[in-house]
Swiss-Prot record:
<comment type="similarity">
    <text>Belongs to the glycosyl hydrolase 15 family.</text>
</comment>
<feature type="active site" description="Proton donor">
    <location>
        <position position="178"/>
    </location>
</feature>
<keyword id="KW-0326">Glycosidase</keyword>
<keyword id="KW-0624">Polysaccharide degradation</keyword>
<dbReference type="InterPro" id="IPR008928">
    <property type="entry name" value="6-hairpin_glycosidase_sf"/>
</dbReference>
<dbReference type="GO" id="GO:0005737">
    <property type="term" value="C:cytoplasm"/>
</dbReference>
<protein>
    <recommendedName>
        <fullName>Isomaltose glucohydrolase</fullName>
        <ecNumber>3.2.1.205</ecNumber>
    </recommendedName>
</protein>
<dbReference type="GO" id="GO:0004553">
    <property type="term" value="F:hydrolase activity, hydrolyzing O-glycosyl compounds"/>
</dbReference>
<feature type="active site" description="Proton acceptor">
    <location>
        <position position="175"/>
    </location>
</feature>
<dbReference type="GO" id="GO:0000272">
    <property type="term" value="P:polysaccharide catabolic process"/>
</dbReference>
<dbReference type="Pfam" id="PF00723">
    <property type="entry name" value="Glyco_hydro_15"/>
</dbReference>
<feature type="binding site">
    <location>
        <position position="125"/>
    </location>
    <ligand>
        <name>substrate</name>
    </ligand>
</feature>
<keyword id="KW-0963">Cytoplasm</keyword>
<keyword id="KW-0119">Carbohydrate metabolism</keyword>
<comment type="function">
    <text>Involved in the intracellular degradation of the cyclic tetrasaccharide cyclobis-(1-6)-alpha-nigerosyl (CNN) formed extracellularly from starch. Catalyzes the hydrolysis of alpha-1,6-glucosidic linkage from the non-reducing end of isomaltose to yield beta-D-glucose and D-glucose. Can also act on panose and isomaltotriose at a lower rate. It displays low or no activity toward CNN and the general GH15 enzyme substrates such as maltose, soluble starch or dextran.</text>
</comment>
<dbReference type="InterPro" id="IPR012341">
    <property type="entry name" value="6hp_glycosidase-like_sf"/>
</dbReference>
<keyword id="KW-0378">Hydrolase</keyword>
Length: 385
């Protein structure tokens, strides 16, 4: 439930600062949105330049939708729909291979990121990741419900994403961080669950031929994670692991794999906070060496979002304030910050390889908008953007 700004106890100066970062976040996202609708992950970062991820974009679109910019979010969903329509034949070929008893190669699966014109691109990447397809289903259904839009506009793309996930939801793949292709990751399963439940419970999609199957698979995901993805009362990084990951709160909010008031949800929030939260900034996982293993803006917002949903307004506000403190002189938010590094000795090699940390990261700005909205801290005119 969204909090009112008056419940946060902020003075006028801090409220103005948080409002200004929200306005800037909207401006950064929309300024860099491609003419075709894609949200670039990070417009100037060497390894991301020229590409858009469904994962980053789905959360970014949610932030923009909450801000009230229906047109910008709609253009992103138009872009994804168009990309997936053009992948109809590829998915049909994959499904036919499965029907023949074949196991398609990872290289034959849909990619996790696309060029702005919807192609795979020529740069090698850790491309087989299924989470973004579930995230997009959740994002587009949520956007349509919020603003009273007709999902027929995106129905062809929805069909492709659903068919793909129903066939390959339980296949090991790379995780949110593009690592460990050999495992089935709980945050990936959570994202798929969220997408399948979103379309399966949507009244406007009830007549779809896959409607019942989406909820059946979602139930199978819940059973699987309950049996193999919970250790010491909390969700874990992958099935069979005991470690936590900063992405795990997404399995609670927004993806509903575990209800927010469930003991597993509370234990997961607590485990992530204990192992990964330092002064309001959340790390990805304990073994993270990427740029030294810093604190990620988007994960701090994700934990804050979950705390807000659980009724911990003070805890959520702590994360929002921390995020606001990380903005650079231009107001831009990076992917991660180096104030507390888990493995500082590894930072230099990544700087040498790819340059300085991605800034701005549109996903960071989108997550700020989401958390600000949860706390009732979007600027008064934002909903009319």
């Amino acid at each position: 439930m969204t909090t009112s700004a008056r419940d946060t106890g902020l003075d006028s100066h801090e409220l103005a600062r948080l409002h200004e970062l929200a306005r800037h976040s909207h401006a950064v996202i929309t300024r860099h949105q491609d003419a075709g609708g894609a949200y670039p992950a990070a417009p100037t970062f060497s390894a991301y330049r020229g590409y858009a991820w469904l994962r980053d974009g789905s959360f970014t679109a949610e932030g923009i939708s909450r801000y009230g910019d229906v047109a910008s979010a709609g253009r992103f969903h138009d872009w994804v729909d168009g990309v997936l329509r053009r992948r109809r034949g590829q998915v049909d070929d994959l499904l036919a291979a499965v029907d023949r008893g074949e196991v398609p190669s990872n290289e034959g699966m849909l990619p996790t990121r696309f060029t702005f014109d919807g192609n795979d691109g020529s740069d090698p990447w850790w491309d087989f990741q299924t989470d973004g397809y579930g995230m997009w289903l959740w994002s587009v259904v949520t956007h349509a419900a919020r603003h009273g839009l007709d999902l027929e506009r995106w129905r062809a793309g929805i069909d492709v994403a659903v068919d793909y996930l129903l066939a390959f939801w339980d296949r090991p793949c790379y995780d949110w961080w593009e690592e460990h292709v050999e495992h089935r990751h709980v945050s990936t399963l959570g994202a798929i669950h969220g997408g399948l439940v979103a379309v399966g419970t949507c009244a406007a999609l009830r007549s779809a031929p896959w409607s019942a199957a989406t909820l059946q698979v979602a139930a199978r995901i819940r059973s699987l994670v309950s049996a193999e993805g919970v250790v010491d009362g909390h969700l874990v990084k992958w099935l069979g692991s005991s470690a936590v990951d900063g992405s795990l709160p997404a399995c609670v909010v927004p993806f509903g794999l575990v209800p927010p008031d469930d003991d597993v949800a509370a234990m997961t929030r607590a485990a992530v906070a204990k192992d990964l939260d330092v002064d309001g900034g959340v790390h990805r996982f304990a073994a993270d060496v990427f740029y030294g293993g810093g604190q990620w803006i988007l994960l701090s917002a994700l934990l804050g979002w979950n705390l807000a949903a659980a009724g911990d307004t003070a805890g959520a506000l702590r994360h929002l304030r921390w995020i606001a403190d990380q903005a650079d002189a231009d107001g831009d938010l990076p992917e991660q910050v180096p104030h507390h590094l888990l493995h500082p000795g590894s930072r230099a090699e990544w700087v040498a390889r790819w340059g300085t940390v991605a800034t701005p990261l549109l996903w960071s700005h989108g997550m700020y908008l989401i958390l600000a909205d949860e706390l009732g801290l979007l600027p008064p005119a934002a909903k009319d953007a």
